[in-house]
Structure formats: C-alpha cells, structure tokens
Curated annotation (Swiss-Prot):
Major localization class: cytoplasm
Name of this chain's protein: Proline--tRNA ligase
SUPFAM superfamilies in UniProt: Class II aaRS ABD-related (SSF52954), Class II aaRS and biotin synthetases (SSF55681)
Subcellular compartments: Cytoplasm
Catalytic activity field: tRNA(Pro) + L-proline + ATP = L-prolyl-tRNA(Pro) + AMP + diphosphate
Assembly and interaction partners: Homodimer.
Length: 442
C-alpha cells in the first residue's frame, strides 16, 4: 500500500478525552474514530489489526476442534424469557420492538441463542462433544463507557460454547479452551496469566480470567513470578490427548494467581516474597463452566448410552478481539507510539522515501516495495512529499515492526537504513541484503 493512496488520518495532538495510552494512540494513529459515547468506527489501519487478531483467534479455535457459526445481533426476547434472564439482565441490555410490536433485543451475549440452535438439531450423545463459536458485534449499555475500545458499549466478541454429556466431558472441553487461549494470547504477543475467577452459585473451580500485566490495568492482581517463565503450549499440542491437556492446565493453575476479588492473604503468604508479583492487570479473556444453567430451563437434552435423556453440560469461552487490540498497545508502546508484535502489525514493514521526486530514492523505494510485496511482506510505502521529521513521527506512531529508510546519501552509497521499531537498532545494508533480510522474515 502507498501512503499517498491510504486513508490514515493522523492526529498531531493528544485527544483530551483519552485517559489511557491505548485510547490516545488509537485515536492519534487513525485506527478508530468515536461516533458517540462508547461507539467507534474502525478505520483502515485499525481494521487491519483487528482482522489479524480475529484470524489468530479463528485458527486456534479451529485447531482446538471448535466450529465457527455466525449468530445475529438481534435476538428474540422470548428466548431470554425461557432462560429467565430477560427481566434479570438489567439496563445494560438494549431492548427494542419491531414494527409488529414483537419484543427484541440487541444481543449482549449468546447463551440462549446457541442453546436453541443446539436443541433444534442434536439428539444423541454420539454427536458430542460439540463446540460452537462465533465472532460478532455486541452491545451493552455501559453506564460510563471509557478508555476507548477497552470499555466501550459496542464491541467485538468471540464467544464459544461447549456441549457435553456430563461434567467429565465438560471439564475436558474447558481444558481444550484453556490451552487454546494460552496459545492465542501468545501469538498475539501477550503474556496472559490465568487467574481463578468467581463461579457464582454454580460453584466448582472451572472459571478463569486471563489477565495481562499492565500499569493501566483496571484490576489489582497477585501472582507467582513462576508464571512469567512458563512455556506456552506449542503448535504440536494434541487437543485430543486428555492427559496432555490436563498436565498443561495443572502446570498453569498450580502457582498462585488471583484478582483482587479472589485474593486470599493466607495463600498469598505461602508464596516466597521474592516470587510475589503485585501489579495492575487487564482482563483479555474469560472461560467458564456453567453446567445445566441454560440446558435445563431450555430443554437441551440428548439421549445417553443408557437410553435415557440427559441435560447437556455447557461452558462458555469469551475473548474480545477489539479489547485485545487495545491491550496489545497497553503492553507494548513507548513515547513515540505503538510497537506492534509482528503477528498483528497492520503492515509487515514501512518503507520511508525521504525525498519523493528524486530519481534515485524513487527507484530504490519502488524496487523495495515490489520485492517485499511479491514476497508477501505487505509493506507500506511512505511516498508523500513531507518533511523528514513528520515522516519519522508517523512511521513510529503507527508502530510497524521494521522501517526501511531510503535517503539520497544512502542511495548514492548503494545502501538503505533498516530500523527495528522495538529495539531502536539501526543498520545500513546494501539494497539486495535488505531485501533478503526482510523477505526471509515473511
């Protein structure tokens, strides 16, 4: 993509309404635009990042055996009355009527609808286990939306729902999603720590929030430093191997980790002082086993191997891709702007033509652009006629992992300067050497 043809509305000043780093940088770098309180448009560069996050989520959900569907945003109030949640949910739910005066709602979540889909088609235990997921926009009428897309009223969610014959099956479905989430966050460039969460009236211990440590986090969290050294399950993880999954979950839940709500001072005291980490954290995912909470009132049953009907045991697993984008910025930025992990960067590299109109600079820039494009690097070429300071500020702000600086002096010497955005390291390379280095990383 050529910057001269790209819609990138950069803001020179920090927006006054932005309270946290991610909100400020997303507005300044032209990723989003606020349309009303807690509601945002995603602009080209922001949408590219969001789509890359969703691609990783899909790949890991599919790897774990989940099936993607797409449920509508508008739901019937009747389904929610079946579960008993319509009147109990509160003012966060946007309730509407169609022209026939039928009561509808803008879905804040999808347990009722996915349970209705399941009960309409699945009759036998032989069709289990089953996991259905979708990625869809949700709306919750927050009293005080703030922090940009971190706590907005409209947001993108990946919701997965598992259906199993009994608790043991549901536990393994939970473990599969647990491991899938560890891999997802690692691929997005985040180190997420699973922390035991409240299970409410259902009880048990199958509820975890995945938290990343960040100074601007909403929650106070406590964890053993051992988490920072745990190896994330690799791409060779066998999601059909129950013993392997159980071992992984055990390793990732044995050290102490808790949010402020679940913190236990007595257990915390057992952690060696030098291993205690007390910090702020951002929730990036939540997984939860809720048994027959929805299958019982909605009649989601299957015939078991004993010939009798059994209520299915369910779980839900949520990740907010839009929130995850903001969390990645909170975890990786500096005073100059965003520092994207390579896996979700909007472009693989930025080529900065320091003197558009100069035959030498134009020729080298075009050669680099063509070579990187053909190699699948997806470069952004800054071919705009602006002063060097503005070009450097823009390329740093949008956070591309690698910058290639093409200037008259370097071109005369047959070289370009390659800068690593994260480390700030610069090296002068011959043009072919630079192409080889960057294409090897594609």
């Amino acid at each position: 993509m050529r910057l001269s043809r790209y819609f990138l509305p950069i803001l020179k000043e920090n927006p006054k309404e932005a309270e946290i780093v991610s909100h400020r940088l997303m507005l300044r770098s032209g990723m989003i635009r606020q349309q009303s309180a807690g509601i945002y448009s995603w602009l080209p560069i922001g949408l590219k990042v969001l789509n890359k996050v969703c691609t990783i989520i899909r790949e890991e959900q599919n790897r774990a055996g989940a099936n993607e569907i797409l449920m509508p945003t508008i739901q019937s109030a009747d389904l929610w009355r079946e579960s008993g949640r319509y009147d109990a949910y509160g003012k966060e739910m946007l309730r509407i009527q169609d022209r026939q005066k039928r009561e509808m709602l803008f879905g804040p979540t999808n347990e009722e609808m996915v349970t209705d889909i399941f009960r309409s088609y699945v009759r036998s235990y032989k069709d289990l286990p089953l996991n259905l997921y979708h990625i869809q926009w949700k709306f919750r009428d927050e009293v005080r939306p703030r922090f940009g897309v971190m706590r907005s009223r409209e947001f993108l969610m990946k919701d997965a729902y598992s259906f199993d014959l009994d608790y043991e099956g549901a536990k393994m479905a939970y473990y599969r999603m647990f491991v899938s989430y560890l891999r997802t966050f690692a691929r997005v460039g985040l180190q997420a720590i699973p922390m035991r969460a409240d299970t409410g009236p259902i009880g048990g211990d199958l509820s975890h929030e995945f938290i990343i440590l960040a100074e601007t986090g909403e929650s106070q969290v406590y964890c053993d430093r051992a988490y920072l050294d745990l190896a994330v399950p690799g791409a060779d993880t066998d999601f059909r191997n129950d013993a392997q999954l159980t071992d992984t979950v055990t390793r990732w839940t044995t050290p102490y980790a808790a949010t402020d709500e679940m913190h236990d001072e007595a257990d915390w005291a057992k952690v060696k002082p030098e291993s205690q980490v007390s910090a702020r954290g951002i929730e990036v995912g939540h997984i939860f086993h809720f048994g027959t909470k929805y299958s019982e009132p909605m009649g989601a049953k299957v015939q078991g191997p004993d010939g009798k009907e059994h209520l299915v045991s369910m779980g839900s697993y949520g990740i907010g891709p839009s929130r995850l984008v903001a969390a990645a910025i909170e975890a990786s930025h500096d005073d100059a702007g965003i520092i994207w992990p390579k896996t979700i960067a909007p472009f693989g590299a930025g080529i900065v033509n320091m003197k558009p109109g100069d035959e030498g600079c134009d020729g080298v820039s075009e050669k680099l652009y063509e070579a990187l494009t053909n190699a699948g690097v997806d470069p952004l070429l800054d071919d705009k006629d602006e002063r060097p300071g503005a070009k450097f500020a823009t390329i740093d702000l949008i956070g591309l992992p690698t910058q290639v600086i093409v200037g008259p002096r370097g071109v005369a010497a047959g070289e370009v300067e390659v800068k690593d955005r994260k480390t700030g390291e610069r090296q002068s390379l011959g043009i072919e050497a630079a192409i080889n280095m960057l294409t090897a990383q594609a």
